[in-house]
Amino acid sequence: MSDSATTDRATDFAFDCLADAVWHDKGQRSFFRYRDLGVTKASGGRMRAEHIQCVNSDNSTTGWHCHDLDFQFVYVVKGHVAFTAEGWGDVVLKKGDCAHIPPFTMHDETAFSPDFEVIEITMPAEVTTLTEKPTSRGTRPDSKMIVDYLDDDSFVRGEGPRSFLEYRDFGFGDATSGLVQAQVVRTNGPCD
C-alpha cells in the first residue's frame, strides 16, 4: 500500500456505549431522536453512523425526498418501517432487514412502529436532503438499490479460527461498484 493511500485516511478509534448515549433532536424530523456513534469524527467526515429511534409514530411521514451523497445504508435494529422508493414501490423493513438507497433515489418513509430503531450509515458525513430530484446529478459511482431481508439461511459459517462466527453479506459490493462492502457477523456458538 502506498504512503499516500495510508496518510489521507482518518485513523481515530471511535466507540459509543448505549448506557452513556447522548440523544439529539435534529429538528427536521420531530418524531426521531438521533445518537451520533462517533464515526464522523473518527473518519474525518468521510462517513457518518447514527442510531435513530422513533419517539412518536403517530401519522408521521418524511415526505418525498432524496439525498445528495455517495452511500446510504439503513439496518433495522428494532420494530419496522414502511417506505415507498422510486423504482421499488412499497417496502417494509423489519428487525434484521436492511437497505442500500442509492444517491438521489426519491423515497418517503410512510409508517413506523412505536419501537422503531435503525442504524444509518452515510458517505460522506454531511448529507444534503432535497425535496425534488435534481435535473443534474453530477457524477456518482454506478449504484443500485438493494433490500436485504433477514434469512437465517443466508449466513455462512466462518473457517479456521473464526469457525464460531457466521457471516451474512448484504451484496453492497456489487450494488455500489465496489465502494462499500458490508456484512453482519454473529456467533454460532461458544467463542473459546
Regions found by a protein language model. Name each.
Residues G87-F104:
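Short acidic-glycine-tyrosine-enriched beta hairpin
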Residues H51-V55, C66-F83, I121-P124, V184-N188:
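Short, conserved beta-strand element in jelly-roll/cupin
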Residues M1-N56, T128-C191:
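A short, N-terminal "cap"/entry segment at the start of jelly-roll beta-barrel domains
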